[in-house]
């Protein structure tokens, strides 16, 4: 859904939405600096943690708790450029750049960061066919290319499987509470938790190693606890 969905989600109509405002857009801006159609690049949005959490919290509050918990959280779909193509920070479409350019200078490490967020953020993670295999493409219709049979990125497929297993294994990622914990330039930290389990997710979108002290007590982790 494009725009504020409050009126549709206030009762008697929709249960939830395809979650652009409280997932796809904030994640894309933060990790790539790109607009979701690859129509604009904004350096001021790349790694902007304040904008990320601000957009997420505002739009999640407009949706409400239950719609957020079952929202369709996608990185790509049939209406927008493939997330992997957005990682090249190139503005363009099939008519202006051509098909090959959609695969130039892409960064699969950024896609993996996005998948971690997709599998740990509140909502229902929804993988658009081929994203798990490393498919690229500009916005519609280039985003609807055939599945790359025989050319799949098997390492990326296995990464998706691992993250899906984690999502399924730990209930806190499916129905637990959420809290932002800390953030800085090009990094964010948030928690998912319930009465039995607490999980801390740290996303570092820098080029270098990051060492930070985190107030994880905010989600109920004791001072001398040992994290796996």
Predicted regions mapped to residue ranges:
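Hydrophobic, well-ordered secondary-structure elements that form the walls
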Residues: 118, 130, 163, 200-204, ...
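Residue-level detector of short, conserved catalytic/binding motifs and their immediate flanks
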Residues: 116, 124-125, 145, 198-200
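C-terminal beta-strand-rich structural cap/linker in extracellular carbohydrate-active enzymes
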Residues: 217-223, 228
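Substrate-binding clefts and catalytic carboxylate motifs of secreted carbohydrate-active enzymes
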Residues: 49-139, 154-155
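Acidic/polar loop patches that form or flank catalytic/metal-binding clefts of enzymes
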Residues: 125-129, 171-177
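Active-site-proximal helices and loops of the catalytic beta/alpha 8
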Residues: 1-66, 71, 117, 134-165, ...
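Carbohydrate-binding surface patches
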Residues: 181-219
């Amino acid at each position: 859904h494009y725009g504020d969905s409050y009126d549709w989600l206030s009762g008697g109509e929709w249960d939830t939405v395809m979650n652009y405002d409280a997932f796809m857009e904030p994640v894309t801006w933060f990790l790539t600096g790109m607009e979701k159609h690859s129509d604009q690049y904004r350096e001021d949005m790349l790694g902007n943690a304040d904008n990320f959490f601000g957009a997420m919290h505002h739009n999640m509050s407009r949706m409400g708790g239950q719609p957020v918990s079952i929202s369709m959280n996608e990185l790509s779909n049939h209406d927008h450029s493939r997330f992997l193509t957005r990682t090249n920070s190139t503005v363009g479409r099939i008519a202006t750049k051509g098909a090959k350019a959609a695969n130039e200078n892409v960064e699969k490490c950024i896609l993996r960061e996005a998948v971690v967020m997709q599998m740990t953020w509140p909502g229902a993670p929804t993988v658009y066919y081929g994203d798990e295999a490393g498919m690229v493409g500009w916005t519609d219709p280039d985003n609807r290319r055939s599945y790359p049979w025989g050319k799949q990125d098997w390492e990326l497929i296995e990464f998706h499987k691992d993250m899906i297993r984690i999502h399924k294994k730990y209930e806190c990622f499916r129905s637990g509470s959420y809290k932002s914990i800390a953030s800085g330039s090009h990094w964010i930290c948030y928690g998912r938790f319930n009465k039995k389990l607490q999980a801390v997710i740290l996303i570092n979108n820098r080029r270098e190693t990051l060492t930070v002290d985190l107030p994880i007590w905010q989600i109920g982790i004791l001072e001398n606890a040992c994290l796996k």
